A protein has these predicted regions:
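Accessory, non-catalytic peripheral segments of nucleic-acid enzymes
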Residues: 130-255, 259, 263-264
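His/Asp/Glu-rich metal-coordinating catalytic cores
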Residues: 1-124, 130
Length: 264
């Protein structure tokens, strides 16, 4: 590991120790955090300081393919705060109230798999007090997977209106103005057969042309056909026979009486 000293007004304030790597992987079975400790930092730098900060490129136990290390190992070290990189979503460990390990994530989501707010943590260390980590949103564009229930939409125009309403609702909870959406249409609807690839692409372009701050990269049609039992009963085909048999079976169950066993 490498070590550095952070000073304020000429006085030692924090020892910083860390390790990363330049290749695509870290040797299996080697603990990337080994040697990153207050004791080693003091020995290497020849000075003591109130705080010790560790910096690691690790997947912890979240991604076992990238220099994994168990969080309990880091928490057992005499290190006040671990700043970790690799996981692209913000995360605090062991709890948000006592965040001794933090992934800031990446400052900008890169694709639809990196949804939600992205930014950095502003961390405050105070002697005798828990670590304080405040999330600061930095992303200029936020990705969002948006499920839209269109079961009550009688027309394609209504579907478009429902999508726009859902976009604004999602934006109200976002940390920035511009958003990219992956829209998933759900619900049982009579429009199911009409929502083919061409119609979905026309919908996407129409919504994208309406609001410059929102962009839909794709719309997935995951709707289904409504199941009308009464209509099936009147058709006289196999579904009607099946439903009739099911009704008779349920009637038979209702006639069964199970009495309590007689105790001797």
């Amino acid at each position: 590991p490498s070590f550095a000293l952070y000073e304020r007004e000429g006085e030692p304030l924090a020892l910083i120790g860390g390790r990363g790597y330049f290749s695509q992987s870290w040797p299996a079975g080697v603990d990337i955090s080994e040697g990153v400790s207050r004791e080693t930092a003091q020995r290497e730098l020849g000075v003591q300081a109130p705080f010790m900060v560790g910096v690691l490129h690790t997947g912890l136990d979240i991604d076992p393919t990238r220099s994994p290390v168990q969080p309990k190992i880091l928490l057992s070290r005499d290190v006040d705060y671990w700043a970790c990189g690799h996981v692209h979503q913000p995360r605090l460990l062991p709890t948000s109230q006592c965040p001794r390990i933090a992934f800031s994530g990446c400052p900008q989501g890169r694709s639809v798999v990196e949804t939600g707010p992205h930014g950095v943590y502003q961390v405050t260390l105070s002697q005798g007090s828990p670590v304080q980590a405040d999330f600061l949103p930095m992303a200029q564009v936020e990705w969002c997977r948006l499920e839209v229930d269109v079961s009550e939409c009688p027309t394609v125009a209504d579907v478009q209106e429902r999508i726009v309403s859902a976009q604004f609702a999602a934006n109200a909870d976002a940390c920035c103005q511009r958003m990219v959406f992956r829209v998933i249409l759900t619900g049982k609807t009579s429009l199911h057969s009409r929502l083919d690839a061409r119609v979905l692409d026309d919908l996407r372009q129409a919504v994208n042309d309406s609001y410059p701050f929102f962009f839909i990269d794709d719309i997935w049609g995951c709707t289904s056909v409504p199941f009308n039992k009464e209509a099936l009963r009147t058709e006289g085909l196999f579904p009607a026979a099946y439903l009739g048999a099911l009704d008779e079976y349920r009637k038979g169950l209702s006639l069964i009486h199970i009495s309590e066993p007689t105790r001797p």
